[in-house]
Regions:
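N-terminal first-folded block
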Residues: 2-42
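A short, internal acetyl-CoA/4′-phosphopantetheine-binding micro-motif in the GNAT/acyltransferase core
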Residues: 47-54
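Short, hydrophobic/aliphatic alpha-helical segments
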Residues: 45, 64-65, 69
Length: 100
């Protein structure tokens, strides 16, 4: 997948909350999933995919990236983003990560 990049940018915020985004870049445009990290909870907030990049399953790629990050770092997830909720409905193997 030449031209693709997944990264996380972090910026500190008050009360030990880290905010950032998981990103995928293609053809000079960036799709992203915004998150917060508070203690051991990863909040998956909002996915944005530029119109030109829609239909390439980037929202699914970003959802999987966020969930894999939570899994590897032993975090729970608080899912607000509808795209991530849709992904979870199709991938129940991640359901144990979701805050109840």
């Amino acid at each position: 997948m030449v031209g693709w990049r997944i990264s996380s940018r972090k910026s500190p915020a008050p009360q030990k909350v880290t905010t950032g985004r998981f990103e995928v870049e293609r053809d000079g445009q960036v799709a992203y999933l915004e998150y917060t990290l508070t203690g051991s909870v990863l909040g998956l907030l909002h996915t944005e995919v530029p119109e030109k990049l829609r239909g390439l399953r980037l929202a699914s790629t970003l959802a999987e990236t966020g969930l894999q990050y939570a899994l590897k770092n032993k975090l729970k997830v608080d899912v607000i983003c509808p795209s991530v909720l849709d992904y979870l409905a199709k991938h129940p193997e991640y359901s144990h990560l979701v805050l109840r």
